[in-house]
Regions:
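Hydrophobic alpha-helical membrane segments, chiefly transmembrane helices and signal peptide h-regions
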Residues: 9-21, 71, 109, 129-130, ...
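Short active-site neighborhood of thiol/selenol oxidoreductases, capturing the structured segment around
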Residues: 61-84, 90
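N-terminal targeting signals for export/organelle localization
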Residues: 1-54, 182-190
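Thiol/disulfide oxidoreductase modules built on the thioredoxin-like
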Residues: 118-125, 131-190
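Residue-level recognition of short loop/turn positions
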Residues: 57-59, 156
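Structural microenvironment flanking redox-active thiols in thiol-disulfide oxidoreductases
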Residues: 84-123, 132-139
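Short loop/turn microsegments at loop-to-beta-strand junctions
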Residues: 49, 71, 147-148
Length: 190
């Protein structure tokens, strides 16, 4: 029974890493966590993560170019059954929220480019970064064994929500709409 204890231990470490990432500049604050969702209030969010890379279809992407937009980042792989199950819900949420200053980005991990492109074709209309080595996932404390995972960045690019499970539109859309409705922090306050 070592394996279940190892999994629980890894999940605890991953959650601690996410909570640490959501704390701000030495403040003694924590984020709210329930049912695999960690949500950080505006005053609890840390500096924006650096998310850059090559798109599956060619060209480059830098999430910093999206400041002013809420960015929903979904980590996925073509080999991941829950990723296949959530694709329609992600696309539905994207279509329902894109006119309110929301954009989506997929990050494909541990995959071949051909398999990733074939998986994405006809499923989602937003771009995906190709990250076969899972560098971006690991930089954001998303171990590949926790895929799928979805991260919602606020309009300043800070991590507002981390979801470590497959998402459904009825759960994700209200979260995205709530973050999109936030007022930007006054200059100099983070």
């Amino acid at each position: 029974m070592v394996a279940p204890r190892l999994v629980v231990g890894l999940l605890a470490v991953a959650l601690a890493a996410v909570l640490t990432g959501c704390t701000g500049g030495g403040r003694e604050s924590t984020c709210d966590s329930a049912n695999g969702i960690v949500e950080c209030g505006p005053e609890q969010r840390s500096d924006p993560p650096k998310i850059t890379g090559e798109l599956l279809t060619g060209g480059s992407y830098d999430v910093a170019d999206q400041r002013g937009q809420v960015v929903v980042v979904n980590f996925w792989g073509s080999w991941c059954a829950p990723c296949r199950a959530e694709a329609d819900d992600l696309e539905g949420t994207y279509q329902a929220t894109k006119d309110s200053g929301v954009t989506f980005l997929g990050i494909n991990v541990q995959d071949s480019r051909d398999k990733a492109i074939a998986f994405e074709e006809g499923r989602v209309s937003y771009p995906s970064i190709f990250d076969p080595g899972s560098r971006l996932a690991l930089d954001m404390d998303i171990p590949p064994n926790t895929i799928p995972a979805t991260v919602v960045l606020d309009r300043e690019g800070r991590i507002a929500v981390v979801i470590r499970a497959a998402v459904r539109q009825e759960g994700l859309q209200p979260i995205v709409e709530r973050i999109a409705a936030e007022s930007p922090a006054p200059s100099g306050q983070r």
